[in-house]
A protein has these predicted regions:
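N-terminal cap/leader regions of alpha/beta-hydrolase-fold enzymes
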Residues: 1-203
Length: 203
């Protein structure tokens, strides 16, 4: 849900001069933020997972439509996904009209690796190798894709756990990996804002 960590991230992007939107993908079931102690509710509202991810595509399409109404929007948006929403980093550029995708500690990404076929926009995927939602075989599969697709960049950090981006994640939170992830995201956004070299190659 859209908790303080996500609102703070949106504010951080805004402080760099970017338009930021954080849609609540769970508004149809159990809306709003949940605490990390609400494990049962968190699981319940995201199931059945494939169906919920598919339904959320409409929310991302609607979000992009709203952005296009803004005078300051240049027509290029990136989708950034964490945990449950990691797959949108692929789905967004694949078929929803987004110009780039970034996933930080995405979950169940093995179900969406085939969606990368035909994607030419920049996709950046970042994990820790101690992420319980990204087993070694998933990391290896994405390594293979990144090795053959120049628009896909993959970063895997040793000892980093799931939810490393989120200060509320307790011991899993990692400042340095978060800083790296933000730096890479801002670099991609800068390309989208100015039509940088990577964007021209992907067009």
């Amino acid at each position: 849900g859209v908790d303080k960590d996500l609102r703070d991230l949106a504010d951080e992007f805004a402080s760099h001069g970017y338009i930021a939107a954080a849609p609540d993908l769970f508004w149809r079931t159990i809306p709003g933020p949940l605490t990390r102690a609400d494990g049962e509710l968190t699981s319940k509202r995201s199931q059945p997972r494939a169906e919920k991810i598919k339904t959320g595509e409409a929310d991302l399409t609607d979000t992009l439509a709203e952005l296009r109404k803004l005078a300051d929007f240049n027509g290029r948006a990136a989708v950034m996904g964490f945990c449950y929403s990691g797959p949108y980093s692929i789905i967004g550029p694949k078929r929803l009209g987004y110009a780039a995708g970034i996933s930080c500690h995405g979950s169940r990404m093995q179900d969406y690796i085939g969606e990368l076929e035909g994607v030419t926009a920049p996709v950046c995927i970042i994990w820790g190798d101690d992420d319980n939602q990204a087993p070694p075989e998933v990391l290896d599969a994405y390594r293979a894709v990144a090795n053959r697709m120049s628009n896909v960049e993959l970063h895997i950090f040793p000892g980093i756990k799931h939810a490393y981006m989120m200060p509320d994640a307790g011991a899993a939170y990692d400042v340095k990996t978060r800083q790296f992830s933000m730096a890479r995201t801002l670099a991609i956004l800068n390309d989208l804002r100015g039509g940088g070299e990577r964007l021209r190659k992907a067009s």
